[in-house]
A protein has these predicted regions:
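Short, surface-exposed ligand-recognition loops at beta-strand->loop->(often short) alpha-helix junctions
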Residues: 9-20
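Hydrophobic alpha-helical membrane-association signature
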Residues: 21-22, 69
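An amphipathic, aromatic/His-enriched active-site/gating alpha helix that lines ligand/cofactor pockets
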Residues: 27-37, 54-89
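Glycine-rich beta-strand-turn "strand-cap" elements at beta-sheet edges
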Residues: 37-51, 74-109
């Protein structure tokens, strides 16, 4: 399984608008449902840097672009960002209920 991590800084003065847009977008995702997607948008405390984690189940087409609000959000995002995003692929080594990993029951000895 692979998880994409995006770090993006937001311009001064755009933070509140960006946060509101993210909340609206995630409310839309909750309303319509995204099958096979795990997605979180977080902000580093006391900073204007967002960290986004995105996981797409194997064999699934990314459903975000089929929701009209998502491309509109991406277009608006262009006016808020400060610099290019840092995009990295992560290999999940361990996870407890965060990503789509199955926990194996360990035997108590």
């Amino acid at each position: 399984m692979s998880v994409t991590m995006v770090r993006q800084k937001i311009k001064d003065g755009g933070l509140e608008e960006a946060e509101a847009a993210v909340r609206d977008l995630f409310a839309t995702f909750d309303r319509v449902g995204l099958e096979g997607v795990r997605y979180a948008s977080t902000r580093v405390v006391d900073s204007s840097t967002f960290v986004i984690l995105f996981e797409l189940a194997e064999g699934i087409e990314d459903p975000r672009m089929t929701i009209p609000e998502y491309p509109r959000f991406l277009e608006r995002l262009k006016g808020w960002v400060d610099g290019s995003p840092v995009i990295e692929q992560l290999d999940v080594v361990g996870s407890y209920n965060l990503f789509g990993t199955q926990r194996e029951e360990s035997a108590v000895r």
